[in-house]
Each structure stands twice: as structure tokens, then as C-alpha cells.
């Protein structure tokens, strides 16, 4: 099989879902902007050579419906001969898009693919039109469909305290704010047009979701939101609601060498795994174990790790069971995570992979891992290697 390489990766800034910069910008526009932007950064790549576009999106309705991948590609003015498909593995959708595109290249069905994802959680809320089959209650607890309650359960099972969660959340904001001030996000963010508070157009070039004023003391004052009587998970220790898109340009290693483009990373291993829906946030553990085994590597070999921060109560048990708690400050979510940046569902998989690759370059790292949990009990993981 062919080796698959990442040639470039980009994302929009993360906009606040409630009254944020992208409140008048549609999901298709965020996606099309990235599609055009990533190709503009790589003029050696002829767009007509792209075989397919794989684009993650969870809430495929309203402006995100009817194959938002194809709609965005047409809006971007890409050649009509390029295919496009919208992928849905809930929170792991754009990482699944990466896996799907990679497999097409590995098997020889494609040489170049454009992958990514989008979610406008302001325009299409996470709970819009949700209608679970009543019969699922015979097999899965109703609470398993409520992500915050699964985080409560996972945190309790692993003895994660409220204080640990508050500290983890404050760390996320502090690191994301420092990364912004020091320009560490600059190479991965494509400035994107939005609207200021007074309605005027402006170009957003930073994540507006980060709250630099966040402290452990401030977080400790928040009330539990999912289990008010006995819970520990608050809005402050949950991933923020945000709007955004992410994109990656991938191709076979042979094609990259032929075009003379810089290879930023190779895909070394990929995996998905299922787990109990009642503790859906544990999915990164079995998914990571499978991906590492396929890559012939161990968790100790990973130099940099991006673990999507759906909830602090979910991230900490995963870090514990993957043996990462003692190396958090050296390896894990070094530029903060979804608690600070937000978790636009269909965008996040390629977003954390983009952040990971930029961190690997900054640290001259050899191996990196991106992994995330998925609602109703799944996990997904990708191991990357720098050339």
C-alpha cells in the first residue's frame, strides 16, 4: 500500500457560537474559504488532480444539509470533476474524513484528496432535530445520549475530583492564550471574514472563544450543569460552543515527491474503537491502543499528543489510563484544547490534527498522536510521523 502524507493543514479561527464573529457567516462559506485557502498556499497542486473531498459534519441539516462538502466545493469554484462527500462519525467526523481519504490513497483509488470538516453550532445547534429511537432504551441508558452525564459517570468511576477538573480547564485557557500571544497558532489559522459586535465586517485572525481571565478560583464558583444535585461537571470544564472549519491536503508520498511539495507528516497508524455508551468519553483509550499497535509504536514513543477536551472529567481518565498524567506539561495539549477553543463537532478531528502537526514541527518531534472521544461510545485515533 502507498504511504499517505500530509502536505498542508489549515483551520479557521474558532468563533463564539453565541453572538460571535461568524453569526452571519454560513458553514459552507467557512468550508469554501478553507478549500480555496489551502490550495492557494500550495500552487504546485493542480486542483483538477484532486480525486475527492471528504468533509466531516455532524448536524447535516439546514445550511449543513444536502452534502455540505459538495456545496462548499462548488461555492469555492473548484473543478466540477472533483467529487465530494460529507462524513459523519459524530465528534470524530473530520478525523474519519482523514482516514477515508487516506485509505483511498493507500489502495490506489486516489493520488490527492482534500479532507476537513465544519460545524456551525450557532446556526445548527447540537440538539437540533434530535430524535433517538425509543427502543434504544432497551440496550442503552437514556443518559448515555447526554454527553455531560457520561462525563459525570466517567469522572466518578476514575475518582476525578472537581478541583482536578477546574485545574485542567484553567490550564487549557492559559495555554491557548499563551499560544495566541506568542503566535503559535499563526501558521495554522487562515484569517476569515466575520462581523464585529457593531455589525461591521472585519477579518478575524485569532480564536475568540478563549477566556484568558479564567482561574481555578473562578471556575470553582460555577454550579454543576448536568447533575445539579450531585455532579462536578460545569460549563467551565466542558468544551466551549464554537463555530469553525478545518482542512488538510493529503496525497501519496510518491505524488508529493513528484510535485516537489514539502511533506509535513506521514500517517503511521489509524484506528477506531467502540466502548460503553455510558462512558463514551473513554473511547480514546482503546482507539489509541489499536492505532499504536498498528503503527508498531508505544505511547512512550509519542512526542506530542492532542487529546480532544470534550470535558475535563473525560480527558483526565483517558490521560490516566494511557499513562500520560506525569507528562502532561511536556506532551499533552500544549496549546490548550477544546475547553478553551471550543469543539465544533465536525471540525475538531482535523483541527486537533492540524494543531498537532504544527506542534510537532515546532518541537522537532518525530511522532505525534491525535485522538478523541465520540458520542454514544466510540473513539478515534491517528498516529503521525514527521519525515
UniProtKB/Swiss-Prot annotation:
Compartments, record wording: Cytoplasm
GO molecular function annotation: acetyl-CoA C-acyltransferase activity
InterPro entries: FadA (IPR012805), Thiolase (IPR002155), Thiolase-like (IPR016039), Thiolase-like_sf_Thiolase (IPR050215), Thiolase_acyl_enz_int_AS (IPR020615), Thiolase_AS (IPR020610), Thiolase_C (IPR020617), Thiolase_CS (IPR020613)
Presence of the UniProt keyword Acyltransferase in the record: yes
GO cellular component: cytoplasm
Keyword Transmembrane helix: no
Protein EC: 2.3.1.16
Keywords per UniProt: Acyltransferase, Cytoplasm, Fatty acid metabolism, Lipid degradation, Lipid metabolism, Transferase
A Pfam family assignment: Thiolase_C
Role, per record: Catalyzes the final step of fatty acid oxidation in which acetyl-CoA is released and the CoA ester of a fatty acid two carbons shorter is formed.
Subunit structure: Heterotetramer of two alpha chains (FadB) and two beta chains (FadA).
Family: Belongs to the thiolase-like superfamily. Thiolase family.
Protein name per its UniProtKB record: 3-ketoacyl-CoA thiolase
Naturally occurring in which organism (per UniProt): Vibrio vulnificus (strain YJ016)
Lineage start: Bacteria, Pseudomonadati, Pseudomonadota, Gammaproteobacteria, Vibrionales
Gene encoding the protein: fadA
